[in-house]
Every structure is written in C-alpha cells, then in structure tokens.
Amino acid sequence: MSLQPSTRRFYEADSLSTEIYDARSATIIPSTSAAGDVDFYRRLAGQTGDPILEVGCGTGRVAIPLAADGHEVVGVDLSEAMLGLAERSRAALAPDVAARLSFHHADMATLSLGRDFALIIAPSRVFQFLLTTEAQRQGLAALRSHLRPSGLLVLDLFDPLLDRVVPTTDAPVRGGELVHPTTGNVVTWEVTARYPDPARQLVVEDWTTREIGSSGEVLRTDVERLTLRWSLRSEMRLLFELAGLDVVADYGDFAGNPPAYGREQVWVLRADE
C-alpha cells in the first residue's frame, strides 16, 4: 500500500482537488449528513463569543463566514496549498472582515499558539487525519490546552459504515463532476482504489481527478491518496475522558438529531473542572 510515484497525499500540494475544494463542498455537503455545518458553527459562535479557532481551516469555507459575522477567527491548517487559497479569498474580503481573520500553517497534534479560545472547531472530519491513538491523544491535549475554561470544542467525524471499512472486492463507484471555478472546464473525480485497513482502523482511498477540455481531451490528471482513521462513538468517549473533556452534546448531524449509525459524529465538548 505504498504510494506510487505519481500518487500524492490529499491536499499536499497544488492540485485539482484543492482548486475545486469549495465548489465540490458546495455540491456534496448539502446532500449529506454534514449539511448545515456552517450555520451550526455560526450559531455556536453567537453563543460563545470570541476568539474562535478553526483547526483544518482549508480554504476558509467556515472561517470566512464566521469572520463576516463579526467574529475574530484564527485558522490553522497543515496544507500550504489550501492556506494559499484561503489567503487569496481573505485578500478579496472587505478590509474590516479581513482584519478579523488570520491563517497559519500548523499541525493540530503539536499546536502551540500561546493563547486560548472561546470556541474551537475541527470541521469536515479533520480530526480523522490523526491516524493513531497516540496522535489522537496528542491532538486532543493540544486542543484542550487552547480552550478557555468556559469554552467549547466541536469535532465532526463520520460514523463508520462497516461495509466501507473492511476489505472488499467491489469496484469503487463514488464520483462526480463539476465545472472548474477558474477555467470553466469540466472536472471529474472518482475513487479508483480502496485499501481498507481494519486492524489499524484506517480507510485508505486513491482519488483520481481529471480536467476535461472542450473537445473531450484530458488536460490534467491528479491521483491522490486519502487516509483517514475511523473511530466508534464509544472509543471517542474514552478518548475524551482521558483528555479531560466532558461531552456537552453528541449529535448525528448538524440539525441536532440524535446519534445514528453511519451518520455524522458531531461532538460538543467542554474542558472538565
């Protein structure tokens, strides 16, 4: 399961997947159990106040609306390519909104910003990029150390569908297409290989993304590997207890519905006293 020379890690560098991230999110998220996530974070921010830390801020999909609402927002991400797009979007904002927003290159597992926050959010399964129990514990400890005594921490994970996290001979079928926001060309993507690793609780997928010209010719092809760790709710509760975090709420989606198999794991947490 080693990376082929032409295979990169997801969001590791400039690629079609980073360029279409916002457009793909706008296409996919509304039809999933993650629908309404931005509004959920906006409501919570109205309750907790500032400052807000977004871990895994990516292109600013969540951070920018929060800043537009008047909040001070700090975004961190490990992907320089995604941060470059976020900074480009920030530069196009009204000066007062841009002044409330900053982006930084940082790893959530070793985060050390020297300040605390009223609200910390880790949207879009960002926590699942921590691939071992040790990394998960380090990440939770780092996040807790940045949390104000009365502050809230929100994590969004997928609740694992067991038929997708075990080895299978079925051919991958997930994919889609959209119009590239800059070039106007059609961009297609599909999961072309899966390497589930249940012993290590990993979902490993190769995603192939292509940009198609007006005559049907393939202009660009990117192959990237997405690796995420899945965890059951019972496992997450134990990790929270070990990290000194109390569960305030546990939802199955961003509408506040109860937990359900195969939906979201939306955790609202507070540092224990």
Predicted features along the sequence, with ranges:
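Class I SAM-dependent methyltransferase "Motif I" SAM/SAH-binding loop
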Residues: 56-58
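Conserved class I S-adenosyl-L-methionine
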Residues: 1-50
